[in-house]
Swiss-Prot record:
Main location class: mitochondrion
Known EC number: 7.1.1.2
Residue stretches spanning the membrane: 4-24, 55-75, 86-106
Record protein name field: NADH-ubiquinone oxidoreductase chain 3
UniProt keyword list: Electron transport, Membrane, Mitochondrion, Mitochondrion inner membrane, NAD, Respiratory chain, Translocase, Transmembrane, Transmembrane helix, Transport, Ubiquinone
Pfam families referenced in this protein's UniProt entry, alphabetically: Oxidored_q4
UniProt-annotated location(s): Mitochondrion inner membrane
Record-linked InterPro entries: NADH_UbQ/plastoQ_OxRdtase_su3, NDAH_ubi_oxred_su3_sf
Domain of life: Eukaryota
Family (UniProt): Belongs to the complex I subunit 3 family.
Gene: MT-ND3
Length: 115
């Protein structure tokens, strides 16, 4: 019962904070708020330049493999647990899914800079 009550309070508080965070900035909208910030000076050129998709894909790939390392770091401590089969299966599935993603990106030439 206490767990259910704590869960309901957390969900209610989260929904309330998300609602306030989306609703509050729209009350006082003016042009300076919508402009990009450039060190306190007026922008020298348009700040809405197109962004290269290659850089975006490399950044997303880096984040995915950074997350993989973060998820695999507790592996040595998890080996000391009683049920190592489940832990090893989970780690194998994680590495397999990420390897398949890398292979797919490689075959789709997402890592090629010359094109």
């Amino acid at each position: 019962m206490n767990m259910l009550m704590a869960l309901m309070v957390n969900i209610t508080l989260s929904i309330l904070l998300i609602t306030v965070a989306f609703w509050l900035p729209q009350l006082n909208m003016y042009t300076e708020k919508a402009n990009p910030y450039e060190c306190g000076f007026d922008p020298m050129s348009s700040a809405r330049l197109p962004f290269s998709m290659k850089f975006f894909l490399v950044a997303i790939t880096f984040l995915l493999y950074d997350l993989e390392i973060a998820l695999l770091l507790p592996l040595p401590w998890a080996i000391q647990m009683y049920n190592t089969n489940t832990m090893m299966l989970t780690a194998f599935i994680l590495v397999s899914v990420l390897a398949l993603g890398l292979a797919y990106e490689w075959t789709q030439k997402g890592l090629e800079w010359t094109e």
